[in-house]
């Protein structure tokens, strides 16, 4: 609820694998924006995750997860304790993630994740942290981050010469574009074969595809949903006359003639529901922001 807590926020990957899961995911998103927003960013707490976890696969996510931050700031024992909390919360719907990044801390974290997989038999998926789509976008991504942090290219060069490269910018050289399976296979062969056993690598790929298929099988109703009115024309007429009486307009005949003419036109175009929906939105806006 304060600046300190905001800085302790962590990442969690949630994947809906059923219609119920999608609804729960929407509920979590809505709650985060309506009740958990702080400094313009939505947040979700453990209580809400427990309440809306059905039909969702959760994973250990990246180095910025609760487990990853515990591993980085405290150590493996604290990270393992966080992992067991997640397993207790999500059960069999909780998976581990390994990533093949050039990020300097990633190999040690992958080793820890594989150790937890061996110890607790939690399935692993293989993912790729993606900050941009194509390899050639790396330079543009770095420039965007410089603009956001108020740095210049010369600032970064000076920091690199001084040996003061920040992880924030180091990540931009960590192969963070969206990769094909062939690219992932090549990366394993050239950089990660001594860290990730081939059988674990293959099993993680299979599990990833399995989860992707489950998520792809969720059928979403994308039709437009609007409030239904049994008799929209009559409802609109009542609201018009109520407003007319409330305003106590002086030249009644002129206004009544105009009301009849415009009301008839609205009904003939079947726009009554539209006006009623607009009235609902205006009323709600006035309720939320009375000033």
Q: Where would I find each of the regions flagged by the language model?
A:
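Phosphate/diphosphate-binding loops
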Residues: 6-14, 122-125, 130-137, 142-212
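Short, solvent-exposed loop/turn elements at beta->coil junctions and helix N-caps
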Residues: 1-2, 131, 227
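Extended substrate/RNA-proximal surfaces in nucleic-acid metabolism proteins
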Residues: 1-101, 105-121, 138-148, 154, ...
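Active-site proximal loops enriched in glycine and acidic residues that flank catalytic Cys/His/Asp
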Residues: 98-100, 126-130, 270
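Non-catalytic structural connector segments
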Residues: 67, 115, 190-291
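Conserved phosphate/anionic-ligand binding catalytic regions in large, soluble enzymes, centered on
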Residues: 21, 61, 125-134, 285, ...
């Amino acid at each position: 609820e304060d600046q300190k807590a905001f800085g302790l926020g962590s990442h969690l990957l949630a994947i809906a694998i059923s219609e119920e899961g999608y609804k729960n995911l929407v509920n979590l998103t809505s709650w985060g924006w309506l009740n958990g927003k702080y400094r313009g960013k939505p947040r979700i707490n453990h209580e809400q995750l427990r309440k809306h976890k059905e039909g969702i696969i959760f994973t250990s996510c990246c180095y910025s997860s609760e487990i990853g931050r515990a591993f980085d700031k405290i150590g493996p024992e604290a990270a393992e304790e966080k992992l067991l909390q997640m397993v207790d919360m999500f059960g069999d719907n909780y998976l581990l993630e390994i990533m093949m990044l050039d990020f300097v801390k990633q190999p040690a974290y992958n080793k820890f994740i594989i150790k937890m997989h061996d110890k607790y038999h939690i399935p692993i998926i293989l993912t790729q942290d993606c900050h941009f789509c194509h390899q050639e976008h790396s330079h543009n991504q770095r420039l965007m981050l410089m603009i956001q942090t108020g740095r210049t290219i010369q600032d970064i060069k000076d920091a690199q010469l001084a040996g003061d490269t920040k992880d924030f910018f180091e990540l931009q050289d960590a192969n963070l574009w969206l990769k094909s399976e062939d690219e992932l296979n090549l990366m394993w062969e050239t950089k990660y074969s001594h860290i990730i056993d081939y059988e674990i690598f293959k099993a993680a790929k299979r599990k990833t595809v399995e989860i992707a298929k489950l998520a792809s099988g969720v059928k979403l109703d994308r039709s437009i949903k609007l409030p239904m009115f049994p008799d929209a024309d009559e409802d609109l007429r009542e609201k018009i006359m109520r407003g007319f009486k409330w305003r106590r307009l002086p030249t009644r005949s002129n206004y009544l003639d105009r009301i009849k003419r415009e009301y008839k036109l609205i009904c003939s175009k079947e726009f009554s529901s539209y006006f009623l929906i607009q009235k609902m939105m205006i009323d709600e806006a006035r309720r939320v922001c009375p000033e």
